[in-house]
C-alpha cells in the first residue's frame, strides 16, 4: 500500500518541482533583461542550450523505439516550436521586462482556464455537467482566474493597507500602466495553452516524448535564431560571456525547456493536459514567497488573497481531474478482465473441440466402417 501511494505521489512531486524551476527562471531572466539583454537573443540561446542538453538522451534511449517521421507529424512539431519557443517565450519575456515576475506570473495564471476551454473545443475533454467531478474542474478553473485577477488588480502593500485602515488615512495607489505588458502576456498565455493541447495530441501519434521534446527545442532554435537576425540586426547583441547572461540562458534552456518539456510530456501521457496546467499558478506563489523572503520585495494584499484563492482553485481542479483518471483506470481494468475472461473461454472451447488430425481419423474410421458394411451386404 505504501509503495502504491508513493507511486501515485510521483506526478504531483514532479510537477511541483517543475514550478520551482519556472519560478527560479523568472527571477534570473528578469535580472538579465533589466540589464539590457535582448529577449530575442535570450530565447535563441535558451533553445540552443535545451537542444544540446536533451538531444543525447533522446538519441541513446529512444533510437530503437522512435516512431517513423511523417509530414503531418513534422508540421505539428513545427507549429509546437512556433507556439512555445517562438511566440510564448518572446512575448512572455517582453512582458516580464516591462513588469515583474509576480505580475507576469499572475497574468499567465489564466493558462489552466484557456487550456480547459481549448481542450473542450478540440473534444479532448468531455463535457459532463451533471457529474460532480466536471463541475469541480469548472469551478476550480474559475477560482484560479479570480485569484489571478486579485493579484493583478490589487497592487496595495499589505502593511500600508493595515496602517491606513487603523489610522483612517486614504490610500493613494500608484498609477502604473501595465497595458502593453498585459497584452503581451495574454497572447503568450494563449500560445502556451495551445502548445499544451497540441503536445497532447502529437504524443498520441508520436509517443517518444523525449525525441519530440528534442525536435521541438531544435526547431525552436532555428525559428528564434531567424527571428533574432530580423529583429536584432546588430550582431553585437549576440555577444555573451561567462556572466549572468550565460547563466540565465543555460538555466532557462536546461530547466525550463528541455526538462520541462520532457516532464510535461510524460505527465500528459500518464495523466492529462489539464493535470499538467493546473500546477501553473504555483509559479507565482513560489516566486512571491522567494521575493519576499530573499529579495525584500513588498508583499501585496492582492498577492496574499490571490495566493490563498489560487491554492483552493488548484486543489479543486486536481480533485476533479483525479476522479476522471480513476474512472478511466477502472474502465481499463474492467476491459482487461473481460479480455482475459474471453481468452479463458476461447481456450476452454478449443480444448473441447477435436484437433484437425483427430477429425481426419474419425472420418477415415467412418469411411472404413461404411465399406465393411457394403462388403457384408
From Swiss-Prot:
<feature type="transmembrane region" description="Helical">
    <location>
        <begin position="102"/>
        <end position="122"/>
    </location>
</feature>
<keyword id="KW-0677">Repeat</keyword>
<dbReference type="GO" id="GO:0022857">
    <property type="term" value="F:transmembrane transporter activity"/>
</dbReference>
<feature type="transmembrane region" description="Helical">
    <location>
        <begin position="40"/>
        <end position="60"/>
    </location>
</feature>
<keyword id="KW-0812">Transmembrane</keyword>
<dbReference type="InterPro" id="IPR000620">
    <property type="entry name" value="EamA_dom"/>
</dbReference>
<dbReference type="InterPro" id="IPR030184">
    <property type="entry name" value="WAT1-related"/>
</dbReference>
<feature type="transmembrane region" description="Helical">
    <location>
        <begin position="13"/>
        <end position="33"/>
    </location>
</feature>
<dbReference type="Pfam" id="PF00892">
    <property type="entry name" value="EamA"/>
</dbReference>
<feature type="transmembrane region" description="Helical">
    <location>
        <begin position="274"/>
        <end position="294"/>
    </location>
</feature>
<feature type="domain" description="EamA 1">
    <location>
        <begin position="22"/>
        <end position="152"/>
    </location>
</feature>
<feature type="transmembrane region" description="Helical">
    <location>
        <begin position="67"/>
        <end position="87"/>
    </location>
</feature>
<keyword id="KW-1133">Transmembrane helix</keyword>
<feature type="transmembrane region" description="Helical">
    <location>
        <begin position="235"/>
        <end position="255"/>
    </location>
</feature>
<feature type="transmembrane region" description="Helical">
    <location>
        <begin position="183"/>
        <end position="203"/>
    </location>
</feature>
<protein>
    <recommendedName>
        <fullName>WAT1-related protein At3g56620</fullName>
    </recommendedName>
</protein>
<feature type="transmembrane region" description="Helical">
    <location>
        <begin position="210"/>
        <end position="230"/>
    </location>
</feature>
<dbReference type="GO" id="GO:0016020">
    <property type="term" value="C:membrane"/>
</dbReference>
<feature type="transmembrane region" description="Helical">
    <location>
        <begin position="142"/>
        <end position="162"/>
    </location>
</feature>
<feature type="domain" description="EamA 2">
    <location>
        <begin position="190"/>
        <end position="318"/>
    </location>
</feature>
<comment type="similarity">
    <text>Belongs to the drug/metabolite transporter (DMT) superfamily. Plant drug/metabolite exporter (P-DME) (TC 2.A.7.4) family.</text>
</comment>
<keyword id="KW-0472">Membrane</keyword>
<feature type="transmembrane region" description="Helical">
    <location>
        <begin position="299"/>
        <end position="319"/>
    </location>
</feature>
